[in-house]
């Protein structure tokens, strides 16, 4: 559903932020 899609996008976004901070 739409909520699941949004959740997945938020996970990807958060993962990108974490990777950016760590590098």
Curated annotation (Swiss-Prot):
Chief localisation class: secreted
A single BP term in Gene Ontology: defense response
Secreted listed as a keyword: yes
Localization in the cell: Secreted
Keywords: Amphibian defense peptide, Secreted
Record-level GO cellular component terms: extracellular region
Tagged with keyword Cell membrane: no
Protein origin, superkingdom: Eukaryota
Distribution of this protein across tissues and organs: Expressed by the skin dorsal glands.
One Gene Ontology term of the molecular function aspect: oxidoreductase activity, acting on paired donors, with incorporation or reduction of molecular oxygen, reduced pteridine as one donor, and incorporation of one atom of oxygen
Homology family: Belongs to the frog skin active peptide (FSAP) family. Aurein subfamily.
Function: Has no antimicrobial or anticancer activity.
Protein name, as recorded: Aurein-4.3
Organism: Ranoidea aurea
